[in-house]
Amino acid sequence: MKFFVLTIFPQFFEGFINTGIVSRAVKKGIVDIKSVDLRDFTEDKHRTVDDVVYGGGPGMLLKPEPIFKAYDSITEKGHKPYVLITEPWGRKFDQKFAEELSKKEEIMIICGRYEGVDERVKSIVDEEVSIGDFILSGGEPAALVIMDAVIRLIPGVVGDSESLNADSFSNDGLLGYPNYTRPAEYRGMKVPEVLRSGNHKLIKLWRRWKQIEKTAVRKPELLKKADLSDSDKKIIDAIKKGLSFEDFLKKYKV
């Protein structure tokens, strides 16, 4: 997959490209990330990328010319990226959106700055995207979030692909279950006995219980959207009745 990031701060992405699974994906040739400096597409000696707002108002806007020229320089080489622009009112970026984008071959992200971009830029945009209801200094941090979430979904990037299915919001959309590693006891806190039992069927059930329990408390709306099995519904009923996991096992003779 190719990413083209249109920005006035290309250096912002250097650490991201050279760190962790993203770096490995780049070295393997699975992912290619190009930071495109909008200032390279200006024509004045000051390399101006912004200007005042027509009609008056605070702040400055990114000018259309550098963005269109940067876009043209990419598409003229035969690239056909799916174009995103970071906007606070855009489509909410979530796991489902990330999964959709992971199927694309090429993605362009236009990073806004100042008061945003000239509205005419939207004529080349496929979707406006927001990572949350808050304001950032620019679209660069949002672009990092989007790329990181998408890249890890691309086949071959994450070593253990099964781990993706256990992530929160993946697969059936519920939150993830708690995980533990060694030592078995630390500062009086013990790893749940079930996880050390070797009973894989019981471990799977416990993890499902914890997923549903966490989701019910923190994001109950996700349960309404999830495709729940009969076993899941029994777990929900038990949680509503205040039963513990152990009580649940006894009641349903699991």
Swiss-Prot record:
Query: What Enzyme Commission number(s) apply to this enzyme?
Result: 2.1.1.228
Q: InterPro entries from the xrefs?
A: Alpha/beta_knot_MTases, tRNA_m1G_MeTrfase_C_sf, tRNA_m1G_MeTrfase_TrmD, tRNA_m1G_MTases_N, tRNA_MeTrfase_TRMD/TRM10
Disulfide bond as UniProt keyword? no
Instruction: Provide the catalytic activity annotation.
Output: guanosine(37) in tRNA + S-adenosyl-L-methionine = N(1)-methylguanosine(37) in tRNA + S-adenosyl-L-homocysteine + H(+)
The Gene Ontology biological process annotation of the record reads: tRNA N1-guanine methylation
Q: Cellular location of this protein?
A: Cytoplasm
Keywords of the record, alphabetical order, are: Cytoplasm, Methyltransferase, S-adenosyl-L-methionine, Transferase, tRNA processing
Classify the source by domain of life.
Bacteria
One matching Pfam family is tRNA_m1G_MT
Outline the subunit composition: Homodimer.
Q: Which family does it belong to?
A: Belongs to the RNA methyltransferase TrmD family.
Say what the protein does.
Specifically methylates guanosine-37 in various tRNAs.
Protein name (Swiss-Prot/TrEMBL):
tRNA (guanine-N(1)-)-methyltransferase
